[in-house]
Amino acid sequence: MSFVVIIPARYASTRLPGKPLVDINGKPMIVHVLERARESGAARIIVATDHPDVARAIEAAGGEVCMTRADHQSGTERLAEVVEKCGFADDTVIVNVQGDEPMIPPAIIRQVAENLASAQAGMATLAVPVHDAQEAFNPNAVKVVMDAQGYALYFSRATIPWDRDRFAQSRDTIGDSFLRHIGIYGYRAGFIRRYVTWPASPLEQIEMLEQLRVLWHGEKIHVAVAAVVPGTGVDTPEDLERVRAEMR
């Protein structure tokens, strides 16, 4: 199937300034992400950024850049600007690959596009099982709960579902009920155009999770378990050092 990858790459970051350009073993992080996306079979790959230095790094690597405004509140809002500038038809499948995932497996980029095509949902995403208690209680690891058909009920930085009886005894171990959301999304261009017309929801603003806007406005998000577990994303300086070590 045909799909387009857009990689939003915002330069400013409170925890890691200039994050897209941090060096990982001789290359800017955003270039590593671009190279992974190239292996996914995407028909077109566009890096959406608000900073000329990021644009120069991508162009030096032979990639396509779309310059966007600096005031977007989320990656999906940045994608919407690209969708309009490029004039994508409403039925174009767009995969949003985060610019801070230098170890993302190309296979799951394609997986989320294929899941969107087969699901009755405006949006598709992926998750992986959580087996580590520290991860289950980490607010930077977003958890998701789904219904019987694989559609998201809620995403949260909190530990959901809360295992009342187990956690009353101990929080050192967890069961098999937890899924960590992976920040990759598939949607059609027309859905992105609709998304940006909706006001931000209170839950989105509390949790700082853009996908909650979709659920708030009554749309479905299909969640599948990732075919390949992705490597570490980069949110903090500690994450960066871990990724550098893993990618050596």
From Swiss-Prot:
Pfam families recorded: CTP_transf_3
Source organism per UniProt: Cronobacter sakazakii (strain ATCC BAA-894)
Compartments, as annotated in UniProt: Cytoplasm
Entry keyword RNA-binding: no
Xref: Gene3D superfamilies: Spore Coat Polysaccharide Biosynthesis Protein SpsA, Chain A (3.90.550.10)
Entry keyword set: Cytoplasm, Lipopolysaccharide biosynthesis, Nucleotidyltransferase, Transferase
Pathway membership: Nucleotide-sugar biosynthesis; CMP-3-deoxy-D-manno-octulosonate biosynthesis; CMP-3-deoxy-D-manno-octulosonate from 3-deoxy-D-manno-octulosonate and CTP: step 1/1; Bacterial outer membrane biogenesis; lipopolysaccharide biosynthesis
Name listed for the protein in its UniProt record: 3-deoxy-manno-octulosonate cytidylyltransferase
